[in-house]
Amino acid sequence: MELQEAIKNRRSVRKFNEENVSKEDIMKILESARLAPSAKYMQPWHFVVLKNEQIEHVYQMMVDKMEKDESTRVAEPTSRTVRRANTLILVFNTMPEESLINMEQSIGAAIENMLLQATELGIGSVWIRMTYIIEDELRECYHMDGMKLSATVALGHYDELPSPRPRKEIEDIMTWYE
């Protein structure tokens, strides 16, 4: 698959089937993240790969949090996506004290590389932010002291790729001066 094709075919997939995402494919996805550009070459990311019972544990932490704190119930649809995923990758910012915008932009580039690599491999993916409701619990559970949870990427095979969403025309999103 060519890059432009992967960009056009990338979708936020939230419904996954039971097929396993192989360790080999996960490593390709992480290698793509590793090669992302980063501000000042700081590479401020650490990835925690979760499978099987660990995914159920994250789901249960989300459910427990939502039961205790009504304001977090907006994450309920996300919790279902988490539970259906074959693989979760927690993306931590290893340098939260540095310029947040630089670190978050760098991490965003790494995540986009992951999503495009997953697309190229025929694996569904979705970039999740709502796991922030259990950031403290995740940091403690997976020993990520001093780090900040930036996002979670859910991966899995799918039976049906979601339809593309409408996009603004190029003329509506740019200004060109010469």
Regions found by a protein language model. Name each.
Residues 39-42, 81-83, 141-145, 166-168:
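Solvent-exposed alpha-helices and their adjacent loops that cap or buttress functional pockets
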Residues 64-66, 143-146:
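Short, hinge-like loop/turn segments at secondary-structure boundaries
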